[in-house]
Design a protein with these regions (language model features):
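M16/MPP (pitrilysin/insulinase) zinc-metallopeptidase core fold and M16-derived inactive scaffolds
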Residues: 88-92, 96-115
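An aromatic/glycine/proline-enriched structural segment found at the starts
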Residues: 6-78, 91-96, 237, 241-259
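M16/insulysin-pitrilysin zinc metalloprotease superfamily fold
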Residues: 92, 116, 120-185, 257-259
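Short, flexible turn/loop "capping" segments at secondary-structure junctions
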Residues: 1-3, 58-61, 124-130, 201, ...
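C-terminal regions of mature proteins
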Residues: 6-8, 173-259
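Acidic/histidine-enriched segments that form metal/cofactor-coordinating
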Residues: 16, 38-45, 50-51, 67, ...
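Buried hydrophobic packing residues in well-ordered domains
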Residues: 7, 67, 83-85, 134, ...
């Protein structure tokens, strides 16, 4: 229906011409009897339940693991703090020549002990909730527990107080990633449309920069305690999963500070 559609123009587009094209091509679309305003959720918030799915495939040379907690929705005030938290732990790939020198503390641990081929943290938001976690690939099947253990220990460290230096570094990396990604009309149009559908408004690059700059170490500690500390996790694993320990053993690492 027309109320579920967003038409965006970016670049050298005349507003009047865009309106004429919209009337020509989309004026026939029906309108819902009870239209939902953009950015509003018509359903009850989803409930996150900790669980796991493992698919063993011994023909694979690697084990692929995703671990996530419930994250922040698009409209949550914790949206940007959770993105900064994701940036603190970052991504790592052993194929990078500078991988042992990357600023993420977790990358040093993984690189030094050859625990994984790569890892990537993510913060995925939806209209009512989100997923925050990590995706890991490893061919070191006998040390999967170490990889998971040290990853979750780093998560818990954020709950006790991240350093101001790593928070500032993560904020700079996040701003560069978000703002430099708007490098063309296609990316800008996609960004405008996504924000309008999910939040009902568009945050300008300046507003995004202000929101990220306002995140403090205390704010990171707060969201880490809210979303990570002793929270249930969802695990999905495929490949050589025989070295991945029991769910309850992994879940216990969400509330212990023992290295």
């Amino acid at each position: 229906t027309a109320d579920r559609m967003v038409l965006v123009g970016a670049g050298g587009v005349e507003h009047e011409e865009l309106v004429k094209l919209a009337e020509k091509h989309f004026s026939h679309l029906p309108v819902a009897q009870n239209p939902i305003r953009l950015g509003e959720n018509q359903y009850e918030p989803s409930r996150f339940v900790g669980s796991e799915v493992r698919v063993r495939d011994d023909t694979s040379s690697t084990c692929n693991i995703a671990i996530a907690v419930e994250g922040a929705s698009w409209k949550s005030p914790d949206y940007y703090p959770m993105l900064v938290l994701q940036s603190i732990f970052g991504n790592w790939d052993r194929s990078l020549g500078s991988s042992p020198l990357m600023s993420s503390r977790l990358s040093h641990i993984v690189s030094t002990n050859n625990l994984a081929n790569s890892f990537m943290h993510f913060s995925t938001s939806y209209s009512d909730t989100g997923l925050w976690g990590v995706y890991m690939v490893s061919e070191n099947h006998m040390n999967l527990d170490d990889m998971v253990h040290f990853t979750l220990k780093e998560w818990q460290r954020a709950s006790t107080g991240p350093s101001p230096a790593e928070v500032e570094r993560a904020k700079s990396q996040l701003k560069a990633s978000l703002l430099l990604g708007l490098d063309g009309t296609t990316a800008i149009a996609e960004d405008i449309g996504r924000q309008l559908i999910t939040t009902g408004k568009r945050a300008t690059p300046q507003e995004i920069e202000v929101a990220i700059n306002s995140v403090t170490p205390a704010e990171i500690q707060r969201v880490a305690q809210k979303y990570i500390w002793d929270k249930d996790i969802a695990i999905a694993a495929t490949g050589r999963v025989e070295g991945l320990l029991d769910y309850n053993r992994i879940r216990a690492d969400m509330s212990t500070l023992i290295y």
